[in-house]
Amino acid sequence: AEEFAKRILVRDYEEDKENSVMVDSPDEFWAMHAAILPLDDSGVAEVQIDDLGGRINLNNLVTASGEVDPITKDRLTRLFRALGITGLTVDPLIDWMDADDQAISAYGAEDGQYLMADPPYRTGNQPFVSITELRLIEGMTEEIYAALRPHLVALPVSGVGINVNTATAQVLMSLHEDMNEAQAESIIAKREEERFENLQDFLALPEFSGMGLKANGLTLQTRFFEVVSRITYDNRVVNMVSTVYRNPEGQVRTVHRDTGQKNRITKEPYTFSEG
């Protein structure tokens, strides 16, 4: 199932290159459907590819030198506001990642708070390995986590831009202080009619008028994807979620696998015949 998804992503890259338009968007076939692959009379594989490029990468928040990236911090702060999150700030996320043991502010949290938990534990002091680590953050609740999850990702690298063709309304609202929900929904409606194939066209939208929004941290391509697989065979079911990376040359490799997940396949099914 995972290898099938990789082949689909390679083919998508080749088609984009042939058309001289290196853009990833929700109207592409891989993004619209979950593939149904008959194994034999006793089994079936379901495969869904999800774009991770439209989310804010948590690991952009603190640089390799330990400095806080102001653009990412501001975007996360605006995302929290767009989602109506009031019981948590970005500061404990910074403290979770940075190498020191000093809380960044009165709203932060370092080892001192976590060691008083039952059972006690320490901060990560490194980039997030998984988005699920957010559950360990001081002040995090299941309600806040559920609200944040569709808009965030923990990639194994920093510096990956947000794909403006796949960003959610809340992520679009995080791009500038003056962006509101109506403007974000208007942008989504426009890209559903015609995707953005040039960042300058995106930045020139009337919704951004007077904001001076820059292209920093924005892109039209996606490098990381989530492959959701569900195998049913002889009445047994196995679920797996993989993170795959497609490099600028179109090669795709797996960077993370997680088994034991609940079924997360939600897209319209499309059955592939043998071969």
Where are these regions (language model features)?
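Compositionally biased linear targeting/interaction segments
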Residues: 1-275
